[in-house]
Amino acid sequence: MPVAVIDGQPLHYVDQGSGPVVVLGSSYLWDRDMWAPQIDALSQQYRVIVPELWGHGESGPLPASTHSLDDLARQTLALLDQLDIPQINLVGLSVGGMWGARLALLAPERINSLVLMDTYLGAEPEATRQYYFSLFKMIEDAGAIPEPLLDVVAPIFFRPGIDRESALYQDFRQQLQGYSKERLLQSIVPLGRLIFSREDVLEQLPKLDADTTLVMCGEQDKPRPPAESEEMAGLIGCSLILIPQAGHISARENPDFVNEALLTFLANNA
């Protein structure tokens, strides 16, 4: 997998296919495999780039210069500069949408179209922020994601009632279990705190181009409920698509629906 050095650390990324560039921004705690169905579908006619978050997949630790989601947006722009890519179509899910929207606000000339999936540009509600911070403290103290926490954290990402014996669930649970103490303390926990203490940028959303922006959300997304997506689509003035039979990682829970929606949107905008 290709690598770029950004802010002194190796950032690994997928680069597959040719044509207009589509950048896929991943969720926290997921590596490039989160987008496997979309990489396959989109790379038939687009150049698909998937940067792996710091401390995830093969990417290096969170650079010391990373203090906010704006820094994640800036680091992605640095990657695009290194690759001599002037304009992109950006699809961001969860934190991928959080930094993705900030990138679009920071450098609108670089964004051809924008899809915000299962994400929210407001601040984290105080109750859930405190809850996630309590989980981070437990992980930090243990130097691991303790066994009892695995089946607390993993279900957050899926629709209620997912088969916990399914490969999708078990593979993700195993990945959580496999994080080293060093990776958790250097990258995963600090990045999580950065994400969930983010600033509210809802008032800036009307600056986004409604004609080239789409909001999508899993109908059964627990951490980022559809009401948040409805609020954002209203502020932007863009279309909203609810994804049936899907929770937070909608790209994996209903990949055929997501692929069709993305291909249709990109055909009209990319």
Where would I find each of the regions flagged by the language model?
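Flexible "cap/lid" loop of the alpha/beta hydrolase fold
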Residues: 105, 112-144
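Conserved HGGG/HGGXW glycine-rich cap/lid loop of the alpha/beta-hydrolase fold
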Residues: 9-65
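Short beta-strand/loop motif that positions the catalytic acidic residue
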Residues: 208-209, 215-217
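Conserved alpha/beta-hydrolase "acid-adjacent" motif
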Residues: 222-228
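Conserved alpha/beta-hydrolase catalytic His-Asp/Glu region
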Residues: 125-130, 145-207
